[in-house]
Structures are given as structure tokens and as C-alpha cells.
Regions:
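Conserved alpha/beta enzyme-core scaffold
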Residues: 1-123
Length: 123
């Protein structure tokens, strides 16, 4: 098992979803976490290179979706759903409400439909 802070895990997922090569962090330098990881020194300060993570499948929940898969979240749904949708090869969304295209204000779309492969009506 590999232990990560929630923020490090989220950033590794975000890096994978948006095609980044990873990110640098000083967190973990001089601890067990640093073993086996590349250390990069910038201006005399050491950083660990945390490589990106990719998911095969993401199962996420949205408050509202249109039939093109554009998603709106409510409350804590905003945390990592958009990041996981961008990261996964296949994204399956359960939506509380599914509306016709054009019935959602585009200014409030949190995840564009391009990241959604399957849409299911939920409870």
C-alpha cells in the first residue's frame, strides 16, 4: 500500500486527466514516502516528482445532466467528480435529473459532456 495525502492523490489524478507529466512537491522529502521517487532540486530546494495517475473507469454522481452528458454538481459533488471524469478512459455518470439539451445554463456546467461515456438516471 502507498500512502498519500488527499491533496497529493487529487493532484496525481488531475495531472493524469489533463495530460501533465506529474507535479513537484516538497511533502515527503526525508521520509519513507521519498524512497524510490525522483528528487528534483530547484533553487537549492528538493522536491519529489509525483507521477500522474490514470483510471480505467470513473463512477460519478451529478445533480443534473443534459442528454449530451454536460453535468452540474451540487454540494460535495464538486470535489473530485470533474477531475475523475477528465481522468478516466470511461466515465459512467448517475444523474439525479436528466434534461433535454439546451435546458441547462452553460455558465453552470461543471463537466462538459465530452468526458462522459455513459449516463444513467438515478434516484
Amino acid at each position: 500500500m502507498i500512502l498519500y495525502l488527499r491533496e497529493q492523490l487529487a493532484e496525481r489524478i488531475r495531472s493524469g486527466g489533463f495530460g501533465l507529466g506529474g507535479f513537484l512537491t516538497p511533502t515527503g522529502i526525508g521520509t519513507e514516502v521519498a524512497k524510490g521517487k525522483e528528487v528534483i532540486t530547484i533553487d537549492g530546494k528538493d522536491y519529489l516528482l509525483e507521477k500522474p495517475l490514470k483510471a480505467d473507469v470513473a463512477l460519478i454522481f451529478a445533480n443534473k445532466a443534459d442528454k449530451n452528458g454536460n453535468l452540474q454538481y451540487a454540494g460535495s459533488e464538486n470535489n473530485f467528480n470533474h477531475v475523475m471524469a477528465a481522468n478516466a478512459k470511461t466515465t459512467i455518470v448517475e444523474a439525479r435529473e436528466i434534461v433535454d439539451v439546451g435546458q441547462m445554463d452553460p455558465n453552470f456546467v461543471h463537466t462538459p459532456g465530452i468526458f462522459v461515456n455513459y449516463l444513467v438516471k438515478g434516484a
